[in-house]
Amino acid sequence: MKTIREQANEIMKEDTSHDVKREKLLKIGLTATDIQNLFFAERMAGREGRAARPVVEYTIDQILARYTFGVEIECYHVRVNELINKATERGLEMHSEGYNHRDNNTYYKLVSDGSIRGENPIECVSPILNGARGGFDTLKACCASLRECGAMVNRSTGLHIHVGGRITEKQYGNTFANYYYLESVIDSFMSPSRRENYYAKKLVGNVDAIVRARTFRQVSEAMNHDRYYKINCEAWGRHHTIEFRHHQGTTDYDKISYWARFCIKLVHWSADNRLNAPVRSIDDIPFLTDDEKTFFKDRANAFAGIAMVNEIMNVQ
């Protein structure tokens, strides 16, 4: 698969207008600032008789390095001591604690959660992670430990992703507005249990206020200071993060890591971009790579197939 740099170079060499190039560059994940720098470099190169080349371009590793993230995995059927032992064998520090919202940078913690149904329920909470500094490696070890000790999920469990870093007020407001316009297409690759859920409510009822919101305070007011939405504004005051609560419970590393990258890239793209209409297709999500689009389309097709089988069974 071509890197963003390679794709950007090819687009800049095309014999098309700046508007066409700008649209294509946005679709591969560049920000408005990145594109402005590219066009500036092109003009300067033209004056000096040299071939144009990109000045600013972010690889996925560079994007991940700019943000922190955290993962909360709700599950049940977990023997805590066994899970801690499995994690320790993989070099992962893990501790069992009572219910709390304390952040840390070093260890995974197991806490109680009264919303989870099933025997031996827990919420497995990661430390503050960075995707370019081994964060996904420790997450993979955590998922392997959970699956090895028989952790299970059901309709009452969810997966929460926190994204933090130097997020500007404009970027914050844009992220919520963009999520509103992406919500329906995201629903297509989420479990039906997460499309209408008390702990992850739809944003649609607050559309006017959300789209108008430009500041931390305005976003919180638009969301009625309620954290139980698919994207949670109240996490900012406590953790200085944006929390994504949309995803169903899972211990599968691929599902978690693809969704975590989606959330991080959405926040990054929102620094300079604000949608003004609903996105109808996964192919039209502007910050995803072809590989990521394929993954989420496969998830959407899987859920559509399950829905079709259920409909047939109900008819019979």
Where are the regions that the model predicts?
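Terminal catalytic/cofactor-binding subdomain
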Residues: 40-149
